[in-house]
């Protein structure tokens, strides 16, 4: 078995390199974030070569080849592949807290829901997730962003499922609660859920990487919304703004520590 855990923007190039060896490739367990990687792998290598997976544990990178497990939550494996149950068993033998899921897409979209939180907002505004949630108006923006994703999931007939160590259904429920009730709970989760790291979009943008997964996460919400006639204005503005910053079409200082500017852009969209 091969393990596929790349950033989504690296997937196309990686698959181009693997295509000539498709008939020799073993099944691929895909742990990448987003909802487009497994279909791309299936198209390049064959439907029988891909196993849908997800990781909820928090991992930190201290240097090249040096990683640390910051918080053990677990691994999700979708049923449907001949190796799914055996793989789940072996992962549990390794104490990785693996769990099988009936529906691959519900599992992947539920994981993506958790990846959306404070991710582009943190990068665009150069603020921590905790700082984003501490701002009442930004918190409202985060909730609306999540509601859009949930509406898109519902339109596709997908279910929100809890993932290992990650109560995703509680996150979905929080979008229906009064802000005064949900905000303290999610604010604490936002500050601790990623271990000691800044959100991934912030890391990529402020390291000058020149690429962002926002097109594969929030952008995926926008594209699915267009397909299923579900409005996604917040996700659209966040995607377009972060892409523009990543491509250096606008300077980082344009929105840095200026939440009112981002909020105004969303309201005027």
List where the protein language model places each region.
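NAD(P)-dependent Rossmann-like dehydrogenase/reductase catalytic/cofactor-binding core
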Residues: 92, 143, 147-150, 154-269
């Amino acid at each position: 078995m091969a393990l596929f855990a790349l950033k989504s923007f690296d997937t196309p190039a990686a698959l181009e390199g693997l295509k000539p060896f498709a008939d020799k490739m073993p099944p691929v367990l895909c742990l990448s974030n987003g909802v487009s990687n497994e279909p791309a792998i299936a198209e390049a290598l064959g439907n029988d070569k891909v196993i849908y997976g997800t990781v909820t544990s928090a991992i930190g990178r201290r240097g090249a080849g040096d990683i640390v497990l910051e918080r053990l939550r677990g691994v999700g494996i979708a049923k449907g592949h001949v190796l799914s149950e055996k793989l789940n068993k072996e992962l549990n033998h390794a104490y990785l807290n693996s769990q099988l899921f009936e529906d691959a897409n519900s599992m992947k979209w539920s994981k993506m829901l958790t990846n959306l939180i404070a991710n582009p907002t943190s990068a665009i505004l150069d603020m921590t997730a905790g700082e984003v949630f501490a701002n009442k108006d930004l918190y409202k923006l985060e909730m609306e962003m999540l509601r859009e994703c949930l509406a898109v999931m519902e339109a596709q007939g997908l279910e929100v499922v809890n993932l290992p160590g990650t109560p995703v259904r509680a996150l979905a429920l929080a979008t229906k609660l009064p802000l005064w009730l949900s905000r303290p709970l999610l604010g604490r989760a936002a500050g601790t859920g990623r271990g000691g790291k800044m959100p991934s979009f912030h890391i990529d943008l402020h390291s000058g990487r020149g690429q962002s997964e926002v097109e594969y996460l929030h952008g995926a919400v926008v594209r699915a919304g267009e397909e299923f006639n579900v409005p996604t204005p917040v996700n659209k503005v966040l995607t377009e703004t972060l892409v523009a910053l990543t491509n250096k079409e606008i300077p980082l200082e344009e929105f840095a520590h200026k939440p009112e500017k981002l909020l105004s852009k969303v309201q005027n969209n």
